[in-house]
Structure formats: C-alpha cells, structure tokens
Amino acid sequence: MRVTDFSFELPESLIAHYPQPERSRCRLLSLEGPTGALTHGTFTDLLDKLNPGDLLVFNNTRVIPARLFGRKASGGKIEVLVERMLDDKRILAHIRASKAPKPGTELLLGDDESIHATMTARHGALFEVEFNDPRPVLDILNAIGHMPLPPYIDRPDEDADRELYQTVYSEKPGAVAAPTAGLHFDEPLLAALREKGIEMAFVTLHVGAGTFQPVRVDTIEDHIMHSEYAEVPQEVVDAVLAAKARGNRVIAVGTTSVRSLESAAQAAKNDLIEPFFGDTQIFIYPGYQYKVIDALITNFHLPESTLIMLVSAFAGYQHTMNAYKTAVEQKYRFFSYGDAMFITYNPQAISERP
C-alpha cells in the first residue's frame, strides 16, 4: 500500500487552533463500520450511543511542559523537546540547533538561562541530557517548560494550554502530546456516563513526539513505527474480559488506547489480553486483525498519517476516506483541538485495501 493512498485535501481554515469553549460541545461524526453510514451530531450524543455495561478505555497520561528554550554555553541557540523522562535527573530529547551538540556540551535553559544541563550521549536522532540541578526533572519542566503544542497549531503556547491541552482525568505525567480524543470529556459528561452504567478503565501510554513525525517512505509496509511506553494493568484486563463475557462492547477513547490494548493482546499468550508494561512499536494499518476493541472515539487525523491508517484498518478504507471527505465538506474542525468521530468496527475491513 502506498502512503499517498491516505492523502486528502484539507483547507487550512479547518485546522483548529483553539478548543471549543465547552469541551463536550464539539461536533461528532458517527461512522457505522459495517455499512459506512454517517450521522452528524454533538459529542454528548455518546450518551445515546453507549449501552449500560459498555466499557470505555481511557489513556490517563498527562502532558508535561516538554519544550525548553536556551542556548549552548558556547553561544548557539537551541530548542529542546523532551521525548521521555529517563529518571529524576535525565531526559531523552530532540534538540534543534544550527549545529548538533556533542557529548559534554553545556546547555543553559530557561528564559533566564538559570538551568544548567549537560548533553551526555547521543542515541540516533535523540540526545540524552542530564540536569545539574537538585530538583527532579518534572519540577524543572513545570518551572521553565512550555506546553508542546503540535506543529500544526501555528501559535505560541499560552498559560491556558496547561489545562486545555490535558484531559480532565490525566494523572500520570510523561506525554509530550495529549491523547486528544479524551479532551472532549468533561466532568458532567463523565458523571452522566457513570449514571447510565457505562464502565470505565484507564491505560497509560506516554505519547511521544514521534506521533507527529511524517511517514517518510512511499510504501507503508516499510515504515518503522516510533516507540512509546504503555501500561495495561490487571484491572484493565479484568474489565475488558468482563465486558466481553457479558456481551458488552469495549470502546477505546483515542488511538493511544487502541494501541495500548492491542499491544497487550499481541503480547498475550493464553488469553485474549494480558497485562502489559513496556515499550510498544505497534503499527496498525489495513490488513490488521483487531483483537479487543469494538468501537473507537477519535479525532480527525493528518493526511498520510499512521493514525488515519489505523482508523482505515478499523472502519474500512473506503468508509474512512468517504467520512473524511464528508467531514471536510461539512467543515468539521480537524486535529488536536478539533471535532471527534465515533466509529463502530467493520469486520470486512481486514480484507479491504486501497
């Protein structure tokens, strides 16, 4: 399959630069996987689409202020984007500079250049940086870091983004991008879902900056997926198996929840799904056999991205591309701060190719 098969025309005006004033009032495009039927509504329509006993699986990662600005002690300006925190003193990061720093290079970070760090090693495209500061890494990032808004949100980050670019249930710091399908859930909607008898479970996948990297090959089978850390604890496994046993659906909130659950299913030896703690490089594209999820809540993704490929593998290629064409025509808002989709599984998707 060619990467260009997953291209579509997207007017710049449809890229959302700010979220809706009220999280749950975004638009919702529902796609019935087996038939391709589309319906238009608002996000709170989920209350009517979910049945008592259905299981929503959320990603409870929390976005860290992962973008740092500063300079090398020798003078050159740098921009640091944390990929992951290694421990209380060290990070793995992308560094943008006119000349890549060498191991041993001293870095001065923050608006006042008060934070001192050392680039200690290079690992391919990533740099290991150690802070020369008594505070834990997370405290330093909270003090001097900027929220790492995606490259397609063409504006500087603002103080409000520290909360707007977080899910209301975020709990475990470590992501450099929000699991954006979850941004639409507010406390009143979560309370209404619980009141209806909807079950909830939480995985963790710390979204890395690689999620924004373009696919740089022509044939998607040649693409090597970036690695991200995921946790699927025993209580999630129990909730999934219980939902399946009683005939209810497992609904992933966001592609990161999909990738967490399907990684746990791939690693399982004896059951449908088993606990999973570790890095995953799972790459889901048409032809993939979904094992766990029955429905998916997700935002609208970039053309030619691995995420639109994941959706195509779930709903079917033709249904997905038609839904995106309709979304553009109907002026849905795209990407992280945009509108959402609710998609049910298409069993025929596995045999469908572009």
UniProtKB/Swiss-Prot annotation:
Main location: cytoplasm
Location of this chain's protein in the cell: Cytoplasm
Reaction catalyzed: 7-aminomethyl-7-carbaguanosine(34) in tRNA + S-adenosyl-L-methionine = epoxyqueuosine(34) in tRNA + adenine + L-methionine + 2 H(+)
Enzyme Commission number: 2.4.99.17
Molecular-function annotations in GO: S-adenosylmethionine:tRNA ribosyltransferase-isomerase activity
Keywords of the record: Cytoplasm, Queuosine biosynthesis, S-adenosyl-L-methionine, Transferase
Functional pathway: tRNA modification; tRNA-queuosine biosynthesis
Enzyme class per UniProt: transferase
Role, per record: Transfers and isomerizes the ribose moiety from AdoMet to the 7-aminomethyl group of 7-deazaguanine (preQ1-tRNA) to give epoxyqueuosine (oQ-tRNA).
Subunit structure: Monomer.
Name of the protein: S-adenosylmethionine:tRNA ribosyltransferase-isomerase
Organism: Salmonella dublin (strain CT_02021853)
Gene name, Swiss-Prot/TrEMBL: queA
